[in-house]
A protein has these predicted regions:
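A broad, low-specificity signal marking well-ordered, structured residues that form hydrophobic/aromatic
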Residues: 7, 44, 99
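Short, Lys/Arg- and Gly-enriched loop/turn segments at beta-strand edges
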Residues: 51-62
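Short, basic/aromatic beta-hairpin or loop at an interaction surface
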Residues: 8-24
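Short, flexible N-terminal segments of the mature chain
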Residues: 22-50
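Residues that cap or initiate secondary-structure elements
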Residues: 15-17, 50-52, 105
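A general secondary-structure signal for short beta-strands and their flanking turns/coil
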Residues: 2-6, 94-96
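A structural detector for beta-sheet-dominated domains
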Residues: 10-12, 47, 102-104
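Short, compact, well-ordered microdomains
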Residues: 60-106
């Protein structure tokens, strides 16, 4: 049994390159216009071990690692009204995904 706070990660929004850049894409995407690994509304539980949830995108996990560790070890985000959660995103500049990461009550 771990000692960290459990978290929930919710996939809030997926964007395409066109959503961000319009018709002036900096590169030509080779893959689908939206992330095909995650679905809007999908939820993942980060257990008290801190391991990446099964089925979660490794790229996004790397991007959320600081937020996850901060919340799991008791940190808060004072600049939010809800200091026990934060909006975060992956750094795929062509097909980004927005997340809500929140502490679960014990």
């Amino acid at each position: 049994m771990g000692f960290r706070t459990k978290l929930k990660i919710t996939v809030v929004k997926k964007l395409s390159a066109e959503d961000i850049y319009g018709k002036n894409l900096p590169v030509t995407p080779k893959y689908p216009h939206l992330c095909d690994r995650l679905t809007e509304g999908q939820e993942f539980i980060v257990r008290d071990t801190g391991a990446m949830p099964e089925g979660f995108c490794p790229w996004a996990w790397d991007d959320l690692a600081r937020v996850v560790l901060h919340l799991q070890f008791g940190g808060e985000f004072a600049f939010n009204e809800e200091s026990n959660m934060i909006a975060a995103c992956c750094t795929d500049a062509i097909r980004p995904v927005m997340f809500k990461v929140e502490k679960l009550e014990h």
